[in-house]
């Protein structure tokens, strides 16, 4: 994984033979064909990932990228910037929404300081290059060199955690004002008008959404990101957390392991990751349909259909934490259900 190009090249297609064998296995379970719907297709998808030798006893972890954004200074958020640092402390203590939901699904949470504008947090893993990204309304979020460095560092973190036993990754984020750069990324990479993408984020009043949209337009106009080059887009109108999430997605794919997406921020990262390495889409598992305005446009571009519709927009990886239970259910179905051939039951073949 010495370069982003090498990282992308390490992502292999799913194993077609394993998928065919898994499909036969699922069709032979004690149930009518396709009666467990998308649980069946999820189990088959997981079976085709070369990094998973088996689907039982999977160890799950959500990596949460925490960072601040210079564009906060443009008045695009109502929550104080210090809340990023405060919530990162709470996350490190296991008190935030993602931590509670992850515990419920037997999933660990790994917060990472990838650019918080604050003092180091005790015992928190750090990949930080600086305290917050640049203000995208005035110039680039970071240099291309820094973006590539953090993509590779985040992917290397995934590889390390995989070697330590993690077999299912989730991705999350924490950063006040980060829906602004996410909206810019989605607007550029999906060729969408910002009006169709920019939403309220963390409860921005409706009368300020137009200003936020104007800031996204300004960021795109000033930085002129190249829509054919996702790394350029991340560096110019993204942020450290978004780059880190993209690296986690690419890293999981390079390890042949699944990565469960979260909401709006993760859609932006996934769109970037899929442009860098189209094969990585096969390793992405959608979780929930974010309530953020641009969610539908982003998901349509990705061609992914979320499992969960709960009007959530917390972020942090909270949707990924919920979806981990669905991943576990698909694996339990695959590994623990009996086979029709041994049951004495004969079912009609569907027309």
Residue ranges and their predicted role:
Residues 1-351:
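N-terminal loops that bind phosphate or other acidic moieties
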